[in-house]
Protein backbone atom coordinates (compact mmCIF):
# COMPACT_ATOMS: atom_id res chain seq x y z
CA UNK A 1 0.00 0.00 0.00
CA UNK A 2 1.25 3.45 -0.78
CA UNK A 3 2.83 5.53 1.88
CA UNK A 4 0.74 8.64 1.17
CA UNK A 5 -2.91 7.89 1.88
CA UNK A 6 -5.91 10.16 1.54
CA UNK A 7 -7.56 11.21 4.78
CA UNK A 8 -10.77 9.22 4.33
CA UNK A 9 -8.92 5.96 3.78
CA UNK A 10 -6.65 6.68 6.74
CA UNK A 11 -9.64 7.21 9.04
CA UNK A 12 -11.26 3.97 7.83
CA UNK A 13 -8.02 2.06 8.39
CA UNK A 14 -7.74 3.45 11.92
CA UNK A 15 -11.30 2.35 12.66
CA UNK A 16 -10.47 -1.19 11.51
CA UNK A 17 -7.33 -1.19 13.66
CA UNK A 18 -9.38 -0.18 16.71
CA UNK A 19 -11.99 -2.86 16.00
CA UNK A 20 -9.31 -5.55 15.73
CA UNK A 21 -8.75 -5.86 19.48
CA UNK A 22 -9.69 -8.51 21.99
CA UNK A 23 -12.59 -8.12 24.40
CA UNK A 24 -11.45 -6.32 27.57
CA UNK A 25 -11.19 -8.32 30.76
CA UNK A 26 -13.67 -6.14 32.61
CA UNK A 27 -16.31 -6.88 29.95
CA UNK A 28 -15.77 -10.61 30.45
CA UNK A 29 -16.15 -10.20 34.20
CA UNK A 30 -19.24 -8.00 33.88
CA UNK A 31 -21.03 -10.46 31.58
CA UNK A 32 -20.03 -13.53 33.64
CA UNK A 33 -17.82 -14.75 30.75
CA UNK A 34 -20.74 -14.90 28.31
CA UNK A 35 -18.90 -12.45 26.06
CA UNK A 36 -15.38 -13.75 25.55
CA UNK A 37 -14.71 -13.30 21.83
CA UNK A 38 -14.82 -10.37 19.47
CA UNK A 39 -16.65 -11.26 16.23
CA UNK A 40 -14.81 -8.47 14.38
CA UNK A 41 -11.34 -9.96 14.96
CA UNK A 42 -9.34 -10.28 11.76
CA UNK A 43 -5.94 -11.65 10.88
CA UNK A 44 -3.83 -9.34 8.75
CA UNK A 45 -2.95 -12.09 6.28
CA UNK A 46 -6.19 -14.09 6.07
CA UNK A 47 -8.92 -11.45 6.34
CA UNK A 48 -9.42 -8.71 3.80
CA UNK A 49 -10.75 -5.21 4.38
CA UNK A 50 -13.67 -3.91 2.36
CA UNK A 51 -12.43 -0.32 2.04
From Swiss-Prot:
It holds the Pfam family Ribosomal_L39. It comes from the Archaea. The keyword Cell division does not apply. One of its GO terms (biological process) is translation. SUPFAM superfamilies: Ribosomal protein L39e. Gene3D superfamilies: Ribosomal protein L39e. Coiled coil: none annotated. Keywords: Ribonucleoprotein, Ribosomal protein. GO terms for molecular function: structural constituent of ribosome. GO terms for cellular component: ribonucleoprotein complex; ribosome. This is Large ribosomal subunit protein eL39. It comes from Thermoplasma acidophilum (strain ATCC 25905 / DSM 1728 / JCM 9062 / NBRC 15155 / AMRC-C165). The lineage of its organism: Archaea, Methanobacteriati, Thermoplasmatota, Thermoplasmata, Thermoplasmatales. The gene is rpl39e.
Amino acid sequence: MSRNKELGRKIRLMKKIKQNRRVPGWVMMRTARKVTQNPLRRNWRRGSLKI
